[in-house]
């Protein structure tokens, strides 16, 4: 069983987040009562991971954990075996006491594209929607955020996050909750909200943008990253079935169309700050994620297209302000 008591205590002392306590404990109790086939096995492995007290942690330039006194070889082998229990590792990379977790995604590349364009995170409370295993949450703390809260309904992502947090020495500035954005009340409590790699999974993208806006304080900043297509403000791709072998994908606007959508739901100062074609260097199969990945999803005869014939993945970052 997971104990979220530390987070409850934390938000009880935050006047902006206090109202969340009206619904959150019951939501997480319901989640605890819903079974997941592998969760018990993952939890046993998590409990065997040693509680860290590392004296060298770098979350500014990477996510790296180490000690002046290195682990013995046997301890390292045991730790690596436990971490591999949580396969597949999709978001990262992490370096833990010399163990390099080479994840499917180079999430650090995305962070490097996003960071120059956003307001400084120092002393901000941050919400990361669809946070995966929390890689970017650690990088947000590295930029001085006061608190990072991530939401993602995946059981495995929560386990991976808690494993890294345990090795970090139980850092209580970051918390991952196994929830979807639709389960959050209108909090209007966060200084910055990130939604990266989520919008195209939403059946109603405008509703998603409103949900994000509802979590921001007045004057707060939205950082939105999603798959887009080339085109003008009227261009939108709606795949008929899969896109790059992904199910549950719905709307791929152009960056210009997405800017219009953000303005339509009430954001101001909307900026397109980055547009980038995803390469097979950024998303690929690794020793820590051995399933198919981007190279398998592109047309082998024309890598500018997916196997379904759609334009290959292109991602845009937009930044906007809530009035």
UniProtKB/Swiss-Prot annotation:
Gene3D superfamilies: Vaccinia Virus protein VP39
Reaction catalysed by this enzyme: carboxy-S-adenosyl-L-methionine + 5-hydroxyuridine(34) in tRNA = 5-carboxymethoxyuridine(34) in tRNA + S-adenosyl-L-homocysteine + H(+)
Subunit structure: Homotetramer.
Family the UniProt entry places it in: Belongs to the class I-like SAM-binding methyltransferase superfamily. CmoB family.
Originating species: Vibrio campbellii (strain ATCC BAA-1116)
HAMAP family the record matches: tRNA_carboxymethyltr_CmoB
Record keywords: Transferase, tRNA processing
InterPro entries: CmoB, Mo5U34_MeTrfas-like, SAM-dependent_MTases_sf
One example GO MF annotation: methyltransferase activity
Enzyme Commission number: 2.5.1.-
Taxonomic classification: Bacteria, Pseudomonadati, Pseudomonadota, Gammaproteobacteria, Vibrionales
Pfam families reported in the protein's UniProt record: Methyltransf_9
UniProt keyword annotation of Acyltransferase present: no
Membrane spanning residue stretches: none
Full protein name: tRNA U34 carboxymethyltransferase
A GO BP annotation: tRNA wobble uridine modification
């Amino acid at each position: 069983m997971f104990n979220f008591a530390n987070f409850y205590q934390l938000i009880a002392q935050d006047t902006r987040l206090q109202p969340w306590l009206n619904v959150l404990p019951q939501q997480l109790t319901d989640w605890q009562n819903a079974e997941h086939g592998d969760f018990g096995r993952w939890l046993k492995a998590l409990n065997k991971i040693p509680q860290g007290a590392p004296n060298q942690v770098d979350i500014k330039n990477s996510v790296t954990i180490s000690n002046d006194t290195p682990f013995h070889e046997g301890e390292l082998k045991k730790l690596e075996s436990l971490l591999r229990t949580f396969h597949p590792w999709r978001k990262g990379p992490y370096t833990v006491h010399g163990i390099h977790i080479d994840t499917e995604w180079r999430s650090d590349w995305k962070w490097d594209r996003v960071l120059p364009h956003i307001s400084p995170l120092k002393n901000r409370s941050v919400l990361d929607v669809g946070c995966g295993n929390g890689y970017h949450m650690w990088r947000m703390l590295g930029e001085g955020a006061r608190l990072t809260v991530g939401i993602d309904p995946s059981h495995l992502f929560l386990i991976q996050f808690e494993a890294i947090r345990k090795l970090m020495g139980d850092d209580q500035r970051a918390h991952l909750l196994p929830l979807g954005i639709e389960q959050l009340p209108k909090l209007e409590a966060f200084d910055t909200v990130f939604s990266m790699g989520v919008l195209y999974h939403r059946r109603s993208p405008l509703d998603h943008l409103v949900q994000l806006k509802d979590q921001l304080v007045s004057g707060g900043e939205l950082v939105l990253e999603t798959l887009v297509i080339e085109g003008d403000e009227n261009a939108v791709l709606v795949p008929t079935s899969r896109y790059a072998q992904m199910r549950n994908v719905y709307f791929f606007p152009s960056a210009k169309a997405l800017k219009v959508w953000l303005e339509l739901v009430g954001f101001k100062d909307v900026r397109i700050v980055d547009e980038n074609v995803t390469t097979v260097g950024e998303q690929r199969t690794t020793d820590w994620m051995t399933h198919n990945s981007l190279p398998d999803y592109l047309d082998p005869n024309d890598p500018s297209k997916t196997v379904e014939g759609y334009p290959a993945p292109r991602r845009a970052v937009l930044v906007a302000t809530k009035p």
